Amino acid sequence: PFHNGHLYHIEKAKELTGADRVIVIMSGDYVQRGTPAVLSKHSRAHMALLNGASVVLELPVCYSCASAEFFAKGAVSVLDGLGCIDALCFGSECGNLEHLTSIAHLLSAEPETYRHHLQSSLKNGMSFPAARCHALEKMTGDAYASQILSDPNNILGIEYLKALKKLNSPIVPFTLKREFS
């Protein structure tokens, strides 16, 4: 359901981007983990419209119930396909676009050294998320970079950035440090 964090995000996104309109993309009747939404999509859309959204679009269920990578790909594809979107503003725990972009570029490029560390970690029984963090830390020598990948909104933000890059989208990314739940 709509909460103070969403209101904060809409207000700060307008301020940060200079936008006078905000398009919100949200899950329909089923959310990312495939569970039914607590409130109907119509109720949630109505709340978003009452609190500053100009338009609410539904993310198709094949994306909304998928991994962060496909969720982001779907959302960015919808926005890019509209042909009139200048900015994408997403929340992240770190709030640092430069760090997120750097990681997104590395994960998109998948250099040989990174792939080697990833495969080695997977063969040693690590889960994919843990192996990815480990490979990133080995590749960059930076524990903070791998720590960024332990937070769900950072992960989603990185996936938005990867999708923008993959689509060669002119949409400019912005991130807000998450202050509310």
Give the positions of each predicted feature.
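N-terminal catalytic cores of NTP/NDP-binding nucleotidyl/phosphoryl-transfer enzymes
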Residues: 1-44
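Divalent metal-coordination and catalytic microenvironments
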Residues: 3, 48, 161
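Non-catalytic positions within long, well-ordered alpha-helices that form the structural scaffold/packing
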Residues: 14-15, 49, 76, 80-81
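Receiver (REC) domain switch/active-site residues of two-component response regulators
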Residues: 20, 54, 86
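A glycine-rich helix N-cap at a beta->alpha junction
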Residues: 45-60
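Active-site cores that bind ATP or allylic diphosphates and position pyrophosphate for catalysis
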Residues: 58-181
